[in-house]
Amino acid sequence: QRQMCIRDRHPSWGATNTGGAWLCAHLWEHYLYTQDKDYLRRIYPVLKGAARFFSSTTVQEPSHGWLVTAPTSSPENSFYVPGDSVTPVSICMGPTMDVQLLTELYTNVIAAARLLDCDADYVAKLEVDLKRFPPMQISKEGYLQEWLEDYKEVDVHHRHVSHLYGLHPGNLISPEFTPELAEACRMTLNRRGDEGTGWSRAWKINFWARLGDGNRAWKLFKSLLHPAVDAATGGHGSGTFPNLFCSHPPFQIDGNYGGAAGVGEMLLQSHEGFIHLLPALPDSWTAGNFRGMRVRGGASIDLDWKDGRATRAVVTALVPGKFTVKMPASAVRAEVTVGGHTYTYKKPAFSLDLNKGEEATVCFF
């Protein structure tokens, strides 16, 4: 028997029922970075169990026949139903965040089952269910729609931007592959604004990095580091405490981890199936380097840049594999040295077949 319950005082956040799917995303991401099949075998029952739970709790939406979660909410925002601009409503069917989470979960379970060569019949069922999920929708004003219907939001500046999960940390939305949805996310973020609690600002740093806007991400990162304690009054708000703990307020470590993740997203991304160097470099970060940052597929990256342009990278394979590198926008060609041999590549990308421990040194011109 599978059960869930609404937690505590208010359904706007207590009815968030897809947290288990979000947690499963972390398990799958660990596999993507390590490519550890033994680990995948250990976590597969958890992924499959979560998918089975949601398969048994989703229902058919009456207007379109979509498969949706219900009852649920889009944390922690509320909306007005047509004809009533007074009463905030939270409980709904199939909010966009839930659709994104279950799409991601089912897709990951299918991929894991195929890698482990198991559960072919169950994979077929999940593939059918995936086709029944609602599409992500753009509102009449151009924003990414938060609910199945184009409802009016109670708070257009709400600190939560739950329906952008598919942009980050998910990978369902990107400027490269879904430009219209990415633009809808951009408009949504501009409408919500940059203000918010510490963790909210941290999440927005990651959003803007995924959209390729390093200057906006950097602006938010600086606001995240703004002193949380008012020197004159002793009161505190959003920002950072003197000990560098992030202030919600009060202290919540989400902002610390999220802010650090945002810097990583500004410098290196790999969620789209290729290695993207300096995808959201702020104009003010004219020169720098990093060492040992990891990418999906099982590689480590070192990178140097100068005058805002990538100059040299080292790709080290931690497992055998094929690694695709997108050419930086500022580069005309890349000279890649592997095993004493040098190869020249031009845009848009190049692929490296590397053995475990093998390095490829890349110079950009």
Segments from the language model and where they lie:
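Structural helix-adjacent loops and short alpha-helical linkers that scaffold large soluble proteins
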Residues: 31-45, 62, 111-125, 173-183, ...
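Long, well-ordered core segments of solenoidal/helical folds
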Residues: 1, 46-61, 130-141, 184-194, ...
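Acidic/histidine-rich catalytic neighborhood
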Residues: 49-112
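Well-ordered alpha-helical scaffold segments within catalytic/enzyme domains
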Residues: 22-36, 53, 57, 101-117, ...
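Long, repeat-rich segments with strong aromatic
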Residues: 154-216
